[in-house]
């Protein structure tokens, strides 16, 4: 077989004509120091703040400190395999998470990767986790109610869609229970919920997920978890990942509830990172920008104007106090950022008042304008009744001979406390809340023994469901109270059938 020179030259010419010079340019640096989840890298001169970088073993990192001679990078994963001298590559991307309908019902980590064993999440949409909060002109004042299903909150400390309401209290006072009940009550309310667990035990997160699944709430909930065993950078990123997933729905005109459980652990993780990055410490060893850490997160909760689609994000951040001290650094910071706080007290919790809400220290700064008219009317005097009861209760312990007016206030107060108690995972529709509070404030419960109040309440709801469904439907549809004589007839009709225990 002879080889022809022309064929060879033709082939070479074709190769030369089709040759495409593809040069990939990577900005790379070298690890000069690594430890405790932090790497110092030399050579990434053009690196952006917050940019993702990739280590040679495939683990991602996030640029935090841009210094003259090196870059301080927090490592978003296992760092044991990273060695001094390893190559680090810029990605040119800011930290992003996947977003969209596909995440609903899933449990993900702060990078948006599924951790529930149900396979990959098939979404091509992503959003950067750090984004600008809506401006003044893009917002609208809070005016729609967000019903939590908890009598004490919906009556005394109402929350509106787009509000930021802090839930604050010691450990084991029922903070998570308040949030879970609120999520359960959003069923059929056209709300999407995002539950962000920061630094929780994995067993606790599993318990929350099972509660949501049992009540059918996972159908509209995304769970973002960075458990206590995860590295500090993931705990720091978790709340931003959660609100980013919520923003996708808000900007599409939907209503979202985001629960951050809890921001104290995020602040502690950020303190750890900052100290390892050698940033100067301030009060309680927190860095100087710990206020900005929380303010830029919570400012992203908003009620958007009609021009922007009228969506909303309601934020329920948690802060854990030590021995009820709400004047510590992180609690005062978050109180000053939010639109009110719900203070849960351990003394009340252990004395059997659950939810253990301290009505005197709790406040909702903007929720009043979102409350339905019926609730406003029946709950108007409730806070004062409760405050004067707590005051008189202290005096009543010293002497037994009280005048009639004082005794009447004490009796009403004891019944008010009893009515505001509620069982776990049993949120109550707003119309039923109005019905029992109407009976309480109009004095229909004054002759019922305190021990029978809870039983009275349950049987009263059953009676209304069977005989006066129109009254409940009227409150639910119009938001107004029915005529006094109709309500009076219903309550008196039930009282005739109710048998007190003594």
UniProtKB/Swiss-Prot annotation:
Single GO MF annotation: proton-transporting ATP synthase activity, rotational mechanism
Main enzyme class: translocase
Top-rank taxon: Bacteria
Entry keywords, A to Z: ATP synthesis, ATP-binding, Cell membrane, CF(1), Hydrogen ion transport, Ion transport, Membrane, Nucleotide-binding, Translocase, Transport
Keyword Metal-binding: no
Compartments where located: Cell membrane
SUPFAM superfamilies, A to Z: C-terminal domain of alpha and beta subunits of F1 ATP synthase (SSF47917), N-terminal domain of alpha and beta subunits of F1 ATP synthase (SSF50615), P-loop containing nucleoside triphosphate hydrolases (SSF52540)
Reactions accelerated catalytically: ATP + H2O + 4 H(+)(in) = ADP + phosphate + 5 H(+)(out)
Family per record: Belongs to the ATPase alpha/beta chains family.
Function: Produces ATP from ADP in the presence of a proton gradient across the membrane. The alpha chain is a regulatory subunit.
Record's protein name: ATP synthase subunit alpha
Species in which this protein is naturally found: Bacillus velezensis (strain DSM 23117 / BGSC 10A6 / LMG 26770 / FZB42) (Bacillus amyloliquefaciens subsp. plantarum)
């Amino acid at each position: 077989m002879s080889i022809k020179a022309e064929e060879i030259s033709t082939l070479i010419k074709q190769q030369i004509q089709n040759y495409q010079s593809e040069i990939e340019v990577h900005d790379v640096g070298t690890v000069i120091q690594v430890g405790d989840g932090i790497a110092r890298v030399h050579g990434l001169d053009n690196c952006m703040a917050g940019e993702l970088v990739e280590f040679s073993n495939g683990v991602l990192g996030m640029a935090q400190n841009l210094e003259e001679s090196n870059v301080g990078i927090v490592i978003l994963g296992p760092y044991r395999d990273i060695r001094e001298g390893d190559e680090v590559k810029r990605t040119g991307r800011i930290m992003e998470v996947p977003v969209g309908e596909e995440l609903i019902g899933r449990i993900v980590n702060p990078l948006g990767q599924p951790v529930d064993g149900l396979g990959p999440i098939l979404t091509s949409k992503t959003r950067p986790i750090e984004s600008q909060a809506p401006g003044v002109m893009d917002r609208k004042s809070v005016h729609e109610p967000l019903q939590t299903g908890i009598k004490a909150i919906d009556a005394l400390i109402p929350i509106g869609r787009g509000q930021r309401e802090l839930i604050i209290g010691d450990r084991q006072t029922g903070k998570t229970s308040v949030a879970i009940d609120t999520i359960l009550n959003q069923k059929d309310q056209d709300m999407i919920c995002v539950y962000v667990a920061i630094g929780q035990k994995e067993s606790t997160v599993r318990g929350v997920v099972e509660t949501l699944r049992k009540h059918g709430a996972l159908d509209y909930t995304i769970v973002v978890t960075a458990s206590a065993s995860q590295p500090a950078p993931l705990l720091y990123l978790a709340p931003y990942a959660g609100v980013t997933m919520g923003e996708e729905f808000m900007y599409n005109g939907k209503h979202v509830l985001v629960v951050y459980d809890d921001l104290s652990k995020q602040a502690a993780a950020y303190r750890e990172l900052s100290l390892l990055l050698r940033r100067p410490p301030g009060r309680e060893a927190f860095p100087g920008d710990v206020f900005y850490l929380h303010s830029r997160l919570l400012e992203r909760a908003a009620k958007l104007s009609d021009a922007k689609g009228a969506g909303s994000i309601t934020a329920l951040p948690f802060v854990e106090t030590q021995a009820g001290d709400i004047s510590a650094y992180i609690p005062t910071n978050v109180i000053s950022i939010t639109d009110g706080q719900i203070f849960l007290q351990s003394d009340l919790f252990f004395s059997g008042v659950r939810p253990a809400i301290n009505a005197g220290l709790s406040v909702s700064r903007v929720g009043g304008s979102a409350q339905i008219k019926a609730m406003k009317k029946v709950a108007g005097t409730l806070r004062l009744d409760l405050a004067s009861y707590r005051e008189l209760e202290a005096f009543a312990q010293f002497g037994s001979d009280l005048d009639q007016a004082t005794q009447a206030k004490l009796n009403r107060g004891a019944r008010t406390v009893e009515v505001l108690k509620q069982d776990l995972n049993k949120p109550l529709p707003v119309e039923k809340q109005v019905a029992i509070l109407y009976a309480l404030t109009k004095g229909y419960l004054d002759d019922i023994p305190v021990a029978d109040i809870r039983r009275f309440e349950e049987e009263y709801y059953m009676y209304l469901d069977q005989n006066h469904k129109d009254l409940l439907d009227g409150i639910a549809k119009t938001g107004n109270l029915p005529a006094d004589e109709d309500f009076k007839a219903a309550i008196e009709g039930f009282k005739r059938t109710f048998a007190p225990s003594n």
